[in-house]
Amino acid sequence: MIDIDGVNLSNEDKSLLSSKHIGGLILFSKNFDSYTQLYNLIKEVRSIKENIIIAVDQEGGRVQRFKKEFTNIPSMQEASIFAKQNDDHGFIKDLAWLISSELIAVGIDINFAPVLDINRNLSTIIGNRSFSDDILEVINNASDYIDGMHEAGMKSSGKHFPG
């Protein structure tokens, strides 16, 4: 899996993408300017390699690569607190479905989410990206999140496992 430097493909990017050794592309904020630009970028990538896997980290909160023209998503800790306070057992699943639907609409195949670590305040990298400091809340919310992704048709990839 490779990444590219900007919002358009360079000749070097096109050459790399056409290599039989490249099977995936991950996109970041540096690759996003607008919904239309992103859609066209992905369309161009697929014209070079139809079966390439295109991925992103679109967790919500501070890890949301595409912001403008996409729904502003809270951190998973904020989402978990909201769901718990409002006794809304479907909120996390619905949120994941929404994120996934927006990504699928522009041509993204996989979202590297959810974070599966437990927020023990040991790492500033994880922090509010985790659903909770409670193991069962993390398990239940992560399961709901993955279900929402799958219902929308998005592949998931749990990351930052406990430890």
Regions found by a protein language model. Give the residues of each.
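Phosphate/pyrophosphate-binding betaalpha-module
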Residues: 142, 146-162
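N-terminal glycine-rich anion-binding loops that anchor highly charged ligand groups
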Residues: 9-23
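Enzymes and membrane/adaptor proteins characterized by extended Gly/Ser/Thr/Asp/Glu-rich
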Residues: 21-138, 160
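Boundary/entry segment of secreted carbohydrate-active catalytic domains
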Residues: 1-10
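Glycine-centered flexibility motif
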Residues: 6, 60-61, 148
